[in-house]
């Protein structure tokens, strides 16, 4: 699982985001496209593509795209151990 792949999938799910504009340090909650519907879409994407469940608390605690990726990666590691 690579951060770059996660970012590409995240971009694909966000409305009005030009591919290649998100960076690991992007504060995703400050994006114009970010809203509660996008949060639900992200939760569904992570479940479908990575097999882990993000919670509202996870989204609240994370600040950057990289933070989100770290949570997904950690949850995936726990599932596989």
Q: Model-found features: residue ranges?
A:
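Phosphopantetheine-dependent thiolation modules in NRPS/PKS and related acyl-activating systems
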Residues: 1-43, 48-81
